[in-house]
Amino acid sequence: MLALGLLAAAFASPAGAAAPVSLHDSFNSQQAYAYTARIAAFGERWPGSPGHRKTEELIYQVLQKDGARVEADSFTASTPRGPVAVRNIIGKFNVSADARQKIFILAGHYDTLFQPGFIGANDGASSAAILLAFADALAGQKTRMQIWLLWTDLEEAIHSFDNDDGLYGSRHLAQTLAANGTASRIRGFFLLDMIGDKDLGVARETGSDRGLQDFIARAARQLGYSQYFFQYEIDIIDDHVPFIRAGVPAVDVVDAMYGRMGPSFDSMGEFHHSNADTMDKVSQHSLEVVGRTILLTVEMLDR
């Protein structure tokens, strides 16, 4: 396989010219880890907090550096804590004038649980950070589809997840895109959640689009990462659900076993929604596995 790749590159590139680097090979896991550490160091990141504002500033800074078209979906959510200002941030790459151009969305939330002392190194920081590394990889890359990087806000429930509490940002944006007709152009939606876990194991989420999951499995197999994907199943309420309800093919790329499992712990592991969700639980290797696999999947779907 390596020899064939080198042969193809030799024929594709003029003498002395470097072969173009693929999207998935442009992913920098060291930078993704550094972004994760930086966001986690901001501390608590519930909407309105200093850490939340610093995270927003970092997202805007990176997107502007990488040449994205930056948009915000801002609104006031009615929550059990009262009105909360919410801002989804979207970085768009390779936008053409063709109104029929397909869209692919890579998403993750950047808020944290309303819990004093909770920094969410994995649950919030890792997903926000890997999207920043995706922005760096996409800078200068050409794709047929528009690629949207979406940072959702107020994913976490105030009390407990139900139809009215939790997923505030994704519910609002999905409803907006369905109402204005954009949802029909979305080729797919990948949500990344808690993907920095040192003991990485991405679940096969049973409500997600099986065809898109199969593309992810193919990409993982090609890269030698199959052992990290779809070895167990789970049904979960997450930011992909409002998009599924809007008719968008969506997959939750989630590690749903964070730490030890058992009756003494949270249903998603001992570190989930725990103040022990800190940087020592996050791995650069896990970010590399997920980042390269997801970007290779996007390349496959863009052909």
What are these regions (language model features)?
Residues 114-219, 223-227, 235-240:
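Acidic/histidine-rich catalytic neighborhood of metal-dependent amide-processing enzymes
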Residues 96-103:
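Proline/glycine-enriched tight loop/beta-turn segments at coil->beta junctions
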Residues 26-33, 46-57, 121-129, 164-168, ...:
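Soluble non-cytosolic domains of exported or imported proteins
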Residues 78, 188, 197-303:
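Active-site-adjacent substrate-binding region
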Residues 72, 90, 103-107, 148-151, ...:
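Structural recognition of the beta-strand scaffold that forms the well-ordered cores
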Residues 18-56, 66, 111-112, 192, ...:
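N-terminal capping segment at the start of a domain
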